[in-house]
Amino acid sequence: MKKKIALIALAVTTALFAACAAENTPSAVSQQESSFAVSSEDKVTALTEESAKETVKLNMPIADKFYAIYNRCSLPVDNSASVTDDNGFCYSPVESVYDTLASLKADTEKYFTKEYLDSTFYKNLADETAFYKDINGKLYKNTDAVSDGKNIWDTTACVISDITDTGFTATVPYLDLYDAHRSAKIEYLLDNGTYKINSWTLNLDAI
């Protein structure tokens, strides 16, 4: 009887050992790691998307401010000190934290890539009708180029796509100055540790 019990115990022990060994075979460990990798990847993706939405939420009011500065000449000026340049355009000294063109550019480049700026905003500084320029060491604005309007951005409804290690794309709905509902596709690029706008395309079709 004792011999029979001993044999049964030995058989159970052998079976348990075999099961444990099977769980620790390369294929089993690989399956466990694979399962962990998938769940971890899902978690990272979710966090990255949430982080991207937060970036858009914080960034859009600032980005829109610069859009208005460069495209609508929105910086306040002292009209009592206006001058007329050699091309016949009226310029007034800017009354803001930006006292020179260099200081304006330095702040702008915190939020936009240089490549984007050179192909968009900075083009409005380049010729004889420049929207802004330094006169006698101070920033002046072309008051003949002023336009009105403001876009209202709904960052709570933005859609994030194309997430990579170096950036993402955000589609953000907005209400334009004509009260038309539209959207913009904005590409953010990681530049020296900061997500900056590298592309900004306005969809002019009403939605």
Task: Walk through the language-model features, giving the residues of each.
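Repetitive helical segments and hydrophobic/amphipathic motifs
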Residues: 11-13
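Positively charged n-region of N-terminal signal peptides that target proteins for export
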Residues: 1-5
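C-terminal motif of bacterial Sec signal peptides marking the signal peptidase cleavage site
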Residues: 16-19
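Bacterial signal peptide processing site
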Residues: 21-23
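Mature, Sec-exported extracytoplasmic domains of Gram-positive
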Residues: 27-207
